[in-house]
Amino acid sequence: MRETLYFKDDDSRLSFLQGNYVTLTNMSDHDIDRICRYHLSPINISFQTMNPDLRCKMLNNRFAGEALKKVDILNEAGIRMNGQIVLCKGVNDGKELEFSIQKLMEYLPNVESVSVVPVGLSKYRDGLYPLEPFNAQDAGEVIDLIEKYQKICMEKYGTHFIQASDEWYILAGREVPEEERYDGYLQLENGVGMIRLLLDEFHDGLERRITEKQSGAGLPWEGIREISLATGKLAFPYLKRMSEEVMQEYPGPVSYTHLRAHETCADL
């Protein structure tokens, strides 16, 4: 067979090589032994919940709860792990989320970080579990709970450990945290800290450009430049804000900024 056909989406090798998240349900004892023997880490794990019964229900797999015992083996072997919890309203949020956070803290420092991300919903859900989207109030409650445990983890372990993805802050109408709260952006590819990193890199670049312009060291920005930015709905306010900041520094020949947020399939 083709080489790529030897890999499944839930294959631990993809987690090590490409950062994929695995549920552990498809991992045999041989797979776990191989990870421990060769010390393949970090391994990214989709926990969803630390409640075994609820995990079986969420993953529609009667072995999903039992699979959590594999985390104990990996932890004892010193395997570094990162985790994610895909949050579903009325299912694994609230008290269940708090329970999961508390249980995952027991695996520090080998579990280095855990991100909490909202479940992605589309209109194509015929025959699927009737999930509801989170609203602004829900997002605020999720953030408050996460930030509560960030303070606890920082005081006890010197790390914020549990992270809220950018969507929560945008949905709640809150500013994203400062860079220090992301612990080196361990969950960047999972949508945690992307907005903060973008803002900080943008402002660093803009300040450098302004300094060059004032000193005459940089190349002059002459003529009219038309720039198109393609973005989704969630990131649109930030792109608009940054474009307006550029316009304040270069109001000359370019007299306006026009951005439009187009609908996408994911509605993001």
Tell me the role of every PLM-derived stretch.
Residues 1-110, 121-149:
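Conserved Radical SAM active-site core
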Residues 43, 224-229, 253-255:
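Hydrophobic beta-strand segments of well-ordered beta-sheets in folded domains
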Residues 166, 229-235:
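Structural motif
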Residues 257-264:
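Conserved small/polar residues in nucleotide/adenosyl-binding loops
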